[in-house]
């Protein structure tokens, strides 16, 4: 479908849902495939964090840091289930209903008063981070991040983990993901969280460094006891 619009792509070698575009990148948003919801723009590493969710999803699914909705769309496509999308900044999700409609995804955008404690079988948290895993294609990010901003991000990530964990029902799963390669934002956050609670266990952890095939990323899957 992309080739009809002069866009040349090939399958990604390790992420089954991803395509590597070698020609016509700027044409994608004007292509028929994009406008009828056959393709979305997303780094392969972001897709990989969803594809590796080899877990049982018993109960509603919540994308807790939905932003523009990339992960919500990926979750919907992979799990083929309705997705609840939430973001502390509701305005960030303004385009999500149209994106969901275009792709045929069943995504319901919700506000904070719609959230329910101990209710969701899966809560996915793609938390705000330094973005260090994507500095290969956005090197200015490395120089614009101040120490104060970084420390603020660490506190925010810790708070998101604490809040999101209360929304997961017993035997449910919590996914913590970043596009960072810095330990403080990744493994250290999970270790701190597990140290302060007896209700959770680490099921899976994955770290990937940046390469020509995708950004660096981290994710962990936690299970509530």
Region roles according to the model:
Residues 1-225:
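S-adenosylmethionine
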